[in-house]
Structure formats: structure tokens, C-alpha cells
Amino acid sequence: MRSMIANYNDAGLDLSYDPEFYALMAESFERSVGRRLAPESQGAEWLYDRSPAVVLAHNTDADPRFIYANRAAQACFEYSRDEFITLPSRLSAEAPNRAERERLLNAVAANGFIADYRGLRIAKSGRRFYIEKAIVWDLVDRSGCRRGQAATFDSWQDVQAD
């Protein structure tokens, strides 16, 4: 299967149910992590609409922008799909935590993935929360070209206001 979408950096792509983008995420995850991203009988629709885990992806821009956020991600971060896919991914962390986030992304780029990540994030409303046991991996197509990075987690904990 050859992808019809050559550049995920184009703004406005709706990848919610795109089977080729789903294959990129699922195959990259399985190659890197050694297990499936979704149950074998499920695909793009299940991952977007029904997965209990948050799944996010950003592109390879110099200032990466989210290109995918499933419904669990939208609920967790309080952004609509249209808001998410125009958002630079650095804005999912507060300014003091962006250097830590950058170190995480560099570690993923060097190793292909990391597991068991914990980090502080911020929702649209300003609600702060820790993501727990996140897996972050590179999106690499079948020809070895890096197309972005993705993350999944199913556990988070709100930070109590002082």
C-alpha cells in the first residue's frame, strides 16, 4: 500500500478515519513497541471513536502541529478536532515544562519510542494534569521516512489547585 498523502505537514487534513494514516500509526507502533495499538479486528474508526486510550500525533514541522487527536484526546485536553489540528503540540504543556517535553521528543527521535512516560500537561480550560504511563513513538512509513510522532496513554491525574 502506497500512501496517497505524501506530506502530513499540510494544514487542515482530516485524518480521523483515514485508513492509510491509521496503518502508519498502527504499523509504526507495532514495529517500535512490539504490540498492537488496537485490537486486531478494529481499525481507524474504532481508534478514533471508541478507543478508551488517548491517541495523539503531530507532524514534522519545525514547530510540530497536532495532526490527529482521537475522541478520548479531545475529551482529555478539551479541544475539538478542528481546534486540535491547528494547535502546535508544544502548547499541550505549560511554558516551564516545554524544555522537559522537548527532551522527551528528542529521546523518542533517538530511540524510536519511549514507554512509561509521565509528564504535566494543560487542557484548553487551563486544567493541569499528569499523563501517566504514556508511550511515545516515531511515525515511520514503510520506506523508513519519519512522518511525525504519536503518543498514547489511558491514565491521567488532575493536579489539585492550590
Can you describe what each PLM-predicted range is?
Residues 1-38:
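Short, low-complexity N-terminal regulatory "tails/caps" that precede and couple sensory modules
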Residues 2-8, 12, 46-162:
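Sensory/regulatory domains in signal-transduction proteins
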Residues 41-45:
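Short alpha-helical capping/linker elements at sensor-output junctions, especially the PAS-family N-cap
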